[in-house]
Amino acid sequence: MNKESLKEYLSSRYQGWNSFLSNVIFPIFGENDFEDGFETELLESQPERRQLAEATGIRSIKQVGMMYVGVEPLQIFDVTVSDRVMMERNRVNIQRLIRAVMDQFSCAFMLFHYEDDTRWDWRFTYCRKSGNKEETTDSKRYTFLLGPGQSCRTATDNFMALYDKRDSLEIKDIEDAFNVEALSKEFFGKYKAQYEAFVNYMVDPANGMRQDFIDTDFDHTGMKADKIRDREEKPIRDYVKKLLGRIVFLHFLQKKGWLGVPAGKEWGEGDRDFMLNIFKNATERQKENFLDDILEDLFEEGLDRNRSDRGDLYDTKVEGFRNCRIPYLNGGLFERDNLDKKPSHFPASYFDGLLTMLSQYNFTIDENDPNDAEVGVDPEMLGRIFENLLEDNKDKGAFYTPKEIVQYMCRESLIAYLQTDQREEDKNCIRQFVTTHDAALLGDLKEDIDQKLCDVKICDPAIGSGAFPMGLLRELFFCRSAIEPNIVENAANIKRHIIQNNIYGVDIERGAVDIARLRFWLSLIVDEKSPEALPNLDFKIMQGNSLLEQYKGADLSTMTEKKVGAGQGVTIFDSMLDVYRKNLRDKLAEYYACPEHDKKAQLRKDIADIVKQELDEQGIRIDFEDMDLSANSQFFLWHTWFHDVFSRPSKEGFDIVIGNPPYGAKYDNQTKRYYKNTYVTANSIRGLQKGSLDTYTLFIELGYNLLRRNGSFAYIVPISLTSSDSLTGIHRIIMGNCDTIHISSYAVRPKPVFENAVVNTSILLFKKTETPCQHLFSTKMHRRGNEFELQRLIDNLNFVDVNGYTMIGRIPKIGSEMEKDILTKIFKNTLVSTKKS
């Protein structure tokens, strides 16, 4: 097997399963153990499978053979797909169908290809089914995209790695070859090197850009020289992050065939290597000033300008692309800011290296989940990269949450929400529906559950790069897709509805907000047949300091409320306030879908004027100078920007608050005083509690306050939640107001259960019932041993009710009823000894 010829083969159109066996499978695994499947058609004898297959767009599934890897059977299937769009949008049903056709406890190779157009890509998938039921969720699917227009470098390298081990192959070797994490680390390393190269070039005074981009307008008092320089150069780092983010976004977009579409051709017929080819085709002079001469104009005049009256045609000024179609995207990703307007110049080698590196990877727009992954760069990986590059993440105690944990927390919080006010006998059906997406399980509940899915209000108050809201977007989408008809036609509309009506997020770091918005935009693009103007997320995913709803000593949380009479304690909305609320609500809704620049600018001004007018009428006389009330790092107007959430009759607040808040941040004395005046748990109360100013404890109290009654809460936090006197305030809140609490705990030694975590962690789940705790479920401390698999750990968490066994600031971590019995005896003996004393 030759590497170059293999890559050429994988980059070609699909040539049939016989050809694939001869060119790939047999050279690696040999032919001696191969058992012919005689092209057995698996759909003919199973009508229920055929019905599911047709709904998924699958015409035929043939078992072409089986072989053994060690002692493990590995089946080989040829899958013919009748409609590409249906397969791309129906991953849930594909998973169900695969589980149905595979033998229990087995592995399989599957070749997916299209019967109606060989220009399209084809897919090689490795599946592993660990359970013994058709509906088990313990199955995984990993896919390489192959064929013309795909980067097959990773697939080639990994098949060659298997070939090198051909005499001693095991199933683990196959799973390692499909390891998305290995690809993620490789990509991040190369991406970070490119990022640092651009930053280092800009900060070098000899290259003439540093002085134009740095920020010197801040208080230097008490700062050392290296800290001053670092602070000055932050705008440069932010500029490079945004530049590279835009370029990576376009690599996702070009996979849709939406860039460089020839005049008169349809969307989807563009150049899938547009970014690299436009650089290659540029003149030497254009390459030497590629950013300002080519890319900046593409960003502003191409992607950020509506040219629908001209057939979306745009002149890139590069031969081969002088008169091509470029989509207008809206959304704000490519809007020019002050830094974009400054001259910037990089040697041609910088963009040559960056674009060549990016071209070696397959970019897959649909985000992977723990059980269904394309081996390539997906938006979730992009989120992880940007979160690792965010300013001071280590100092703020932030770490990226593994996707297995994201899915677990999203599903548990959604299940708790959907089970609210349901009969006990229906709750298990709801849980099974959320994990399997089988709507038949709901019976007569289907309409009620769908309405609750449409109405839910979700918030991550420390959104980072958007992992949890994106996770819940996926869960809501899959659940609604299982219930609602015509999912193929309605996929993009369902996602737009979810983003506009269900999801809210805030982060203090502007870069985090930018990447979170980018991921939501990509989630829409994956389901669009042709480009549509992206929504404006400025008032949905917002920058702000979640913990502060005050500025210069003034409380800004009551802007939408008016008190009647001193001491009456009754809140009403008078006619003027109703007008204010309606105007603000209408302007925000109009802004969300507005595609015109001038109109957007006017709407932003109108919105700011409405808020400032209300501040003035409330007697809040503060000079906000040039501060943007909707995007700053000083405070956040929860009850203003998200007033639609807090004004719902009998449901004032969010249904779900979820996240991975930072911990251990440092504050100045003024901020500490505000926190102590605002957060009950920040104060020590003699005989009751010891106060905590740790960031994560403040976020827990904030999250609790943001919830409506019976709202669901899910945070991942440091394990001191279960083992510190300073957490007694948090314990008083949740033990006094949450009927059922779940806490699972995870160690960092000998190796972190959650990669990149530097402290032991706990996942805290509860429902805000406003009644005392009846059940406090806890797990043992989970550690990472040999043959560790995070998904298996999460699927098999064992909770024990330890209510009544807590001590001041301490919650037991036990994993079995036997351990609980031992704890009971210890408590009894301690009580007897205390009485004797």
Predicted regions and their residues:
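Short, surface-exposed amphipathic charged segments that create phosphate/polyanion-binding patches used
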Residues: 552-560, 754-763
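P-loop NTPase motor core
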Residues: 499-503, 511, 533, 537-560
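Conserved SAM-binding loop
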Residues: 516
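Adenylate-forming
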Residues: 702, 746-750, 780-782
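Preference for the N-terminal adenyl/adenosyl cofactor-binding alpha/beta module
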Residues: 2-99, 106-471, 475-477, 506-511, ...
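Short mixed-charge
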Residues: 422-449, 481-496, 525-535
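Flexible, glycine-/basic-rich loop-and-beta segments that form/coincide
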Residues: 755-834
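SAM-dependent methyltransferase catalytic-core segment centered on the flexible catalytic loop
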Residues: 458, 467-494, 549-593, 606-609, ...
